[in-house]
Amino acid sequence: MMTDLSLTRDEDEEEAKPLAEEEGAREVADREHMFDKVVTPSDVGKLNRLVIPKQHAERFFPLDSSSNEKGLLLNFEDLTGKSWRFRYSYWNSSQSYVMTKGWSRFVKDKKLDAGDIVSFQRCVGDSGRDSRLFIDWRRRPKVPDHPHFAAGAMFPRFYSFPSTNYSLYNHQQQRHHHSGGGYNYHQIPREFGYGYFVRSVDQRNNPAAAVADPLVIESVPVMMHGRANQELVGTAGKRLRLFGVDMECGESGMTNSTEEESSSSGGSLPRGGGGGASSSSFFQLRLGSSSEDDHFTKKGKSSLSFDLDQ
């Protein structure tokens, strides 16, 4: 007799399991998805409230005049079967529908962050009046890496420096120290500064340059405006032979005493570019013969003078 009772209980339990599974499957199938809400920083912040979009609030959680002041208590279940109770009300100050009490506890338990998605569902009862509310959540979707933003694709052009053949300084000095390589920095005047030059690398001619070549920035000498041209003209100098004497004068010209003596003798001396730095100009005399050397030695003068009576 005892054996028959035990067998009967086992058969009843086995029949009850499929029935419970069918009811659970039917319950899941009868769930109606209401809406999703992407939580904002304020929804998971210190305000401790969740703003429900107006169109969804008025459709699924309507409030009458009696419950508008105090609000409603809504009971939800998550996927694990845990119950959550939220106070749902309307705020006249912000004219928004919000869930306040109990929401902060849900945020802490699920560790919600801004961008996460909260989903609301319901299961309508057989009578059509009573319904069970469900709440679920999921992390914000990860943005896939777009091929357009791959490394090197955002910067289609890289820059490198031009060769010395295209520099501003090369056309002035190429006949003196053109080596086909770098610059001869020892022969660069002080008036030359340093600048930066870049040129675009055409990807059509060299597709690998856009990815492989790094961006290189170095300084190259460039000629400053105005002063360098005057200095080059001044240092080149001008030569004049006057009364058997070879004279070389710089840019700034001669002194006043020399100009007076040369003008009284009927001669004129050419002037340089005018207005250059007087400290860098120079005046040199070179005698043309040994007799002229003796002539100046006998006079015992260290400065230049001209005797028109000779």
UniProtKB/Swiss-Prot annotation:
The entry's DNA-binding region:
35-141
| Disulfide-bonded cysteines | none
Please note every region of biased composition (Low complexity).
251-268
Q: Which SMART domains would you find in this protein's record? A: B3 (SM01019)
Q: Listed GO molecular functions?
A: DNA-binding transcription factor activity; sequence-specific DNA binding
Q: Give one Pfam hit by family name.
A: B3
Note down the stretches annotated as region Disordered: 1-26, 251-310
Give the main location: nucleus
Record-level GO cellular component terms:
nucleus
Q: Which UniProt keywords apply?
A: DNA-binding, Nucleus, Transcription, Transcription regulation
Single GO BP term: leaf development
Task: Say if the entry is tagged with keyword Transcription regulation.
Answer: yes
The answer to whether UniProt assigns keyword DNA-binding to this entry is yes
Location in the cell: Nucleus
Per the record, the coiled-coil ranges are: none
Q: Ranges of Basic and acidic residues compositional bias?
A: 16-26
- Complex formation: Interacts with BRX. Interacts with BZIP30.
**Reported function:** Regulates lateral organ growth. Functionally redundant with NGA2, NGA3 and NGA4.
Q: What is this protein called?
A: B3 domain-containing transcription factor NGA1
Look up and give the organism this protein is from: Arabidopsis thaliana (Mouse-ear cress)
